[in-house]
From Swiss-Prot:
E.C. no: 3.6.5.-
An MF annotation (GO) of this entry: GTP binding
Gene: obg
Family indicated by similarity: Belongs to the TRAFAC class OBG-HflX-like GTPase superfamily. OBG GTPase family.
Protein name: GTPase Obg
Principal location: cytoplasm
Domain OBG-type G: 161-338
Amino acid sequence: MSMFLDTAKIKVKAGKGGDGMVAFRREKYVPNGGPWGGDGGHGGNVVFVVDEGLRTLMDFRYHRRFKADDGEKGMTKGMHGRGAEDLIVRVPQGTTVRDADTGKIITDLVENGQEFVIAHGGRGGRGNIRFATPKNPAPEISENGEPGEERNLELELKVLADVGLVGFPSVGKSTLLSVITAAKPKIGAYHFTTIVPNLGMVRTKSGESFAVADLPGLIEGASQGVGLGTQFLRHIERTRVILHVLDMSASEGRDPYEDYVAINNELETYNLRLMERPQIIVANKMDMPEAEEHLEEFKKKLATNYDEFEELPQIFPISGIAHQGLENLLEATAELLEKTPEFLLYDESDFQEEEAYYGFNPDEPEFAISRADDASWILSGDKLEKLFTMTNFDRDESVMKFARQLRGMGVDEALRARGAKDGDIVRIGKFEFEFVD
């Protein structure tokens, strides 16, 4: 049986911006030509695109790293380097993307053709033509390209079924699916026969069609990961209608009503919104001895939880193996689907807030200072490290510009306040220099 892979961890890296160029106009009859170095091109983005033709995340099992191309370097004559093409990564419909480092949901990809930029490419570094001023008409300054965004991601694929079959193991879900659809699930008289979702399409006599998922068997404690646990619950989140299958024969000595309550408790514990989905109770194995008596007892117990103004869930007595009562069940399911809207999987607060990629966050410190064991000073911080990465250290003027930027950020004053002395070693990454007081 082919394996259904519904989670995958991958790494994406957008392209680096191309380096800016230092060049000067040197042409006959053009004395003292000015700066002519162009900007680097923009690095490629990594873009997720929903492809309804994909059904699993299996491809990501063998291909876990995705890197977009870098932008081209700037050229002479003030010409910009070519920007890199975006890297398109196709994902199945229904993929949820999380930040693997924080666990926060980044996006939920549910519409065919939907696009989402998951990693932004770096901007190109500026060439020396951009740094010309009246005081410095021939600057030997250029910038390196900005690094592309890099992210560790976790992908989750939830079964895109309209209807989910839930119930304790071996209540007859797989048999029911096999007789109402063309699906061929593995069927057996032991717990956890179904360990991955089985999908099938139903077409009623009236012409309605919908997708049904026979989901892995559930036991008490699933919301805490017992048994197949949260794997099961993850698959049911997308279904709009739940068919709650119960074994009315009580052949294993179980009480159908206790099973019904236990499974609903697990659904509610995992995600309160799961209980908002309408349920149809499927009283299965009605061809077995004493099933009628068990069903009547179940109805009495169920009624005690509802007052006279509340509507009880619909109950359909069937026998999957004997093909009894199926037509009425399917017509009622199609009718309920027709009037049931799609459910949001998460509250809006679960999603990461969109921020401008190059935006300024005033609450975020621009740099941090720490002391190494060898008494050197260590500078760190996203903004500072970005400036460092984009500095062309092959050019003296670029190095001097970087030093001015550090002073403008208050690095010199902060080092002095921490006790830095003339000649102390200061490090940024692998680069080191002497502090001059």
